[in-house]
Each structure stands twice: as C-alpha cells, then as structure tokens.
Amino acid sequence: NKIVNMAGHFAGLNFEVPEDIRQPQNLKLDKNGKPNKMNATYRQMAKLRSIYPKNQVKVLNIIGDIGGKTDGTVPNVSSLSLKYIIGNRAKSYRVMKFTGKNARHSRLHENAQVDKALIMFLWNK
C-alpha cells in the first residue's frame, strides 16, 4: 500500500480562507513534524494518529519550493506537518522537495521530475 501527498496544506493556508483552515501565524514544526500551533482542522486530523495503519503504508510527501519556503500557494511548513499526523506508523515516510518555477503549486502535477518520482515510487520503474 502506497500513498502520495502533493502540496498538501495540512496545517493550513496563509490567505483569506475560513479560520478553521487558516495557517496559524509563526507556525513552526518540531523534529517530529508537530506544529507549535494547530488550527481546528489540523487538530481533527491529528486525532487520526492512533488509528493510521501501523507499518502498512509507504508515504511519499511531495512539496514544491519556488523560493521563500513555499510553492506559491502552500507554505512548506504546512505540507511538512503531515509527518506528525502519520507519526511513526507509516511503513516508510519520505519527503521530496522540488525547486524552481516548475515547483509552483499549480505546476507540480505537470513537472517531469515529479512524474519520474511518482513512477519510481508507485511502480518501481
């Protein structure tokens, strides 16, 4: 079993969105990916930590960085907070960061490097 997360806004977004999904100001993660502040949506997702399948799922977390630690829409800190939700329950957890103009949020799914990484992860080709 494998799962790919691409440009996930787990800890929230920094623009005008409902407060429940807005990223808290000055968000930081500890070494386990745990945010120093959590919005309501993240608190709900964090409750799933104890029921996430143990040692069954390989996880690939793809993030983009066009500069400034963001893909232009989702701050990297928000995407990286997935680590805490999954905790140490995943069979494996890997982050792949892509940089440059083709790492923009809306372009990640069209990025040839991302495609190669997905093919390798999902089908070992």
Regions found by a protein language model. Name each.
Residues I51-K125:
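C-terminal catalytic-base region of ester-bond hydrolases, centering on the histidine
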